[in-house]
Amino acid sequence: MENPYEIVGVVAREILDSRGNPTVEVDVYTHVGMGRAAVPSGASTGTHEALELRDGGKRYHGKGVRRAVENVNKIIAPELIGMDVRWQREIDALLLELDGTENKSNVGANAILAVSLAVAKAAANSLELPLYQYLGGVNAYVLPVPLSNVINGGVHAGNDLDFQEFMIMPIGADSFREAIRWVSETYHVLKKVIMEKYGKNAVNVGDEGGFAPPMKEVTEPLDVLIKAIEEAGYKPGDEIALALDVASSELFNEETGKYVVGGKEYDRGELLELYKDLTSTYPIVSIEDPFHEEDWEGFVMITKELGHKVQIVGDDLFVTNPKRLRKGIELGAANALLLKVNQIGTLSEAMDAAFTAFRAGYGVIVSHRSGETEDATIADLAVALNAGQIKTGAPARSDRNAKYNQLIRIEEELEGVAVYAGKRFRKVFF
């Protein structure tokens, strides 16, 4: 008898991401359904990330992904035909086997991830289940707090701000719908506040939809955010808190061993003092990548000093890699994981990293990349994991709002059951 869940087709293609760069999209077909997934790419990438395969040469300035697409169509597809689409772990294991390298450099992490996610979506579709329910079961019901990147600096913007992201977190809202309304209202007030202070040319948006005003000192965006939150009618800290992504690896001078912030040099201890000052002055509840990706000692220090009141997030530190995460847990470095599926390469590995973090009492933030697509898989993943947090940009640009809109739909589907993480975003024990 024919298995309706048998994979009968796998097709990859080259499409464009939100920055106009090529990326990989894959369709997976069964007898009764199909799944489509497109992969993102990052601008500030960790050294230990899985390798995104690019073509080189003149085409698309070397950023083409025809090799990755060909690897799906010629190497992966023939192996997947006939397999049961519900065998996610077996399929992910096969993808790793076909590549054969630790950093997925043969077939390409972009090829592998697109297939892995498309398989999960095809399975959910074939079973007539929403993706979050297929991945998380009946216990997937926590809607995440958005960490919305409304002011951009670093490599995401063309200004002199050294810290990469200044985010708002609507922790005091009662539902996701209310939370995203608060974010949207604050974002529009912020635009007005920035225009008044810096002029109409200061509200250009960065890769993630946030504004990139001509600021230099790290306190400037924090002051402007407090003003915008208050003018929007909310209480800073109690209703809307602040979060930072420092992306410190970009600020580290290998020769001097020091960090450069606002034109000044800081050693590890001095930078820690800066963070202590900022967290005592502003309602900052989360700091991502406060130190260089190999500065384990710096992460241990800040976690000891501030971890009781501030979430210390490892992004470039962990790169969603279970080995690096386990090392961090042993050392007491950071207390939260930034989960980016394309840093590790398969859905199974990403979910394993999340479970490792949860078991250690670490928080998990499901995250986008700066180069995104209209694919909203991470919205479903955040709910499937009951992660309690999602980082997917400002409430602007369709590639960012696709995720927020999907979360609005999921909350509607889960009416009467859905719980918004709110102030318990770090430890979601409902």
UniProtKB/Swiss-Prot annotation:
Keywords: Cytoplasm, Glycolysis, Lyase, Magnesium, Metal-binding, Secreted. One of its GO terms (biological process) is glycolytic process. SMART domains: Enolase_C, Enolase_N. Belongs to the enolase family. Its cofactor is Mg(2+). Binds a second Mg(2+) ion via substrate during catalysis. This is Enolase. It catalyses: (2R)-2-phosphoglycerate = phosphoenolpyruvate + H2O.
